[in-house]
């Protein structure tokens, strides 16, 4: 389609659209119906700017065993120019020969003048070499170690160096071809690029827009994948840290994740730190990094890596995950059964299974394990046994974090809370996860005069029973919900229907879900 002067051509997530000149980012999103969540950042690249980028000096060479990158020493040298003009012609070539000193892809014809001279080569040097000093029998030679050889190289000799993926040089064999060669655009050189939430931004011809990124989660990391599902349960990822090599989301920092998958952190790799400072933090690689014994790979960005590279600290990005999460907790059997049947998953019902049942436990617990087994067992209880709570993170942030962490409400919609003791109108609970070992409960939001019925309290570190959780069914102006004095009690929220506690006994467990009230509701009240 011919574009007139009154029109512009814009790409949105890889699809082309023709828009009137002067159209905004919001117009493009409306026309394209792109996947987008209000308030998230959108990346924009000016293609005209990309064409004006400085000389490209780095190239990615993909093989069946992984990717390596080479950097040109001098793009203006004869071999540098030859490479830049003809690198696509080397795709599909196989390793013709390999030795302990070097390996060679080819042969192919090249416009070089081979010299009958012995050359000295360092490990990871890249050079053109003509077998039998015949330019029709040219090879791309990569040095494995320091050595001396006569390859029929042109006068300028070594023209590039392997800068990443060096371990691949020692694993490649004769059946391995070059799958593709792509230039690496240095994004820092692109002045005309942006990542914005402003939908009134005016677009120009040949702009490319990226509204979301898509992730494929690794079946080798079922628990790590569940961590990522929990992190992005609202369809967004927070950009808390940005560097040249990664972005990270700290929302689930300090939430433990097991190490499951040792892989190269390729561009777009999603990893979770499993030990040490920053445990639970999720990273997305902007460039290739070595494998790490403290970073478990949980997935890979398969669409929208541009948005990852453009993102700025403090922004939220829209994300979609494959496969979609399977979460039964908080739902009825009637809600989940047809969905599971449609994707070939057998549902086994246990516990209370009547019409008013709500699912509070599932086995296997993770999406990828359920898909692998094509079967899930769900445990139900009467809906009145599910206790809904409203928490006060603004008033007691540390204590609410302790509560959510202890009940695993950060990663699951329903948490379990064992009943420790009941007396008078007081109910005391002890969490299954002993979070007091590594989380402090400092005094915050301590009551001043009266604690209302149904308010949830946690004993802070001013008393011996730190971490005890309590609720009372009556107002009290002397002691907090855990039976401690006010100065030893942090109020973290309230139970919406405290009468649901009536009838439970010591040794039982209640199931808890968090309800987030809308600000409009609060304003009306």
Swiss-Prot record:
Q: Which InterPro entries match?
A: Methan_mark_3
NCBIfam families named in the record? methan_mark_3
As for family, the record states: Belongs to the UPF0288 family.
The protein's name: UPF0288 protein MA_3997
């Amino acid at each position: 389609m011919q574009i007139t002067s009154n029109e512009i051509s814009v790409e949105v997530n890889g699809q082309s659209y023709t828009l009137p000149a002067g159209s905004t980012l919001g117009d493009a999103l409306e026309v394209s119906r792109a996947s987008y969540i209000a308030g998230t950042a959108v990346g924009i690249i000016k293609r005209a700017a990309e064409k004006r980028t400085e000389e490209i000096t780095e190239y990615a060479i993909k093989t069946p065993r992984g990717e390596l990158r080479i950097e040109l020493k001098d793009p203006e040298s004869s071999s540098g120019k030859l490479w830049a003009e003809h690198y696509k012609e080397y795709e599909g070539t196989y390793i013709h020969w390999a030795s302990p000193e070097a390996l060679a892809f080819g042969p192919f014809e090249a416009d070089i003048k081979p010299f009958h001279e012995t050359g000295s080569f360092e490990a990871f040097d890249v050079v053109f070499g003509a077998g039998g000093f015949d330019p029709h029998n040219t090879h791309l030679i990569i040095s494995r170690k320091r050595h001396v050889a006569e390859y029929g190289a042109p006068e300028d000799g070594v023209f590039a160096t392997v800068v990443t993926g060096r371990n691949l040089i020692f694993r490649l064999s004769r059946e391995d071809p070059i799958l593709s060669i792509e230039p690496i655009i240095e994004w820092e050189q692109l002045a005309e690029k942006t990542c914005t939430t402003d939908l009134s931004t005016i677009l120009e011809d040949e702009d490319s827009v990226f509204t979301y990124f898509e992730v494929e989660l690794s079946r080798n990391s079922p628990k790590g994948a569940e961590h990522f599902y929990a992190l992005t349960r609202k369809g967004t990822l927070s950009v808390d840290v940005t560097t040249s090599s990664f972005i990270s989301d700290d929302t689930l920092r300090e939430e433990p994740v097991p190490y499951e998958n040792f892989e190269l952190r390729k561009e777009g790799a999603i990893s979770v730190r499993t030990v040490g400072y920053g445990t639970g933090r999720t990273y997305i690689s902007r460039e290739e990094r070595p494998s790490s014994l403290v970073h478990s790979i949980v997935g890979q960005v398969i669409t929208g890596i541009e948005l990852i590279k453009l993102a700025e600290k403090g922004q939220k990005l829209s994300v979609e995950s494959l496969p979609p999460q399977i979460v039964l907790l908080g739902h009825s059997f009637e809600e989940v059964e047809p969905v599971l049947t449609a994707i070939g998953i057998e549902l086994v019902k246990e516990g209370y299974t009547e019409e008013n049942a709500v699912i509070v436990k599932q086995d296997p617990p993770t999406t990828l394990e359920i898909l692998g087994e094509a079967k899930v067992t769900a445990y139900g209880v009467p809906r009145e046994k599910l206790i809904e709570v409203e928490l006060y993170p603004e008033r007691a942030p540390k204590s609410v974090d302790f509560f959510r962490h202890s009940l695993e409400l950060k990663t699951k919609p329903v948490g379990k809370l064992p009943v420790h003791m009941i007396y008078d109108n007081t109910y005391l609970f002890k969490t299954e996860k002993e979070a007091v070992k590594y989380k402090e409960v400092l005094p915050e939001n301590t009551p001043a005069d009266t604690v209302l019925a149904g308010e949830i309290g946690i004993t802070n570190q001013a008393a011996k029973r730190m971490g005890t959780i309590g609720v009372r069914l009556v107002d009290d102006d002397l002691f907090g919900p855990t039976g401690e004095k006010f100065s030893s009690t942090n109020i973290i929220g309230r139970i919406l229907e405290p009468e649901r506690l009536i009838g439970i006994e010591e040794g039982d467990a209640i199931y808890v879900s968090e309800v987030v009230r809308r600000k409009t509701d609060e304003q009306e009240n």
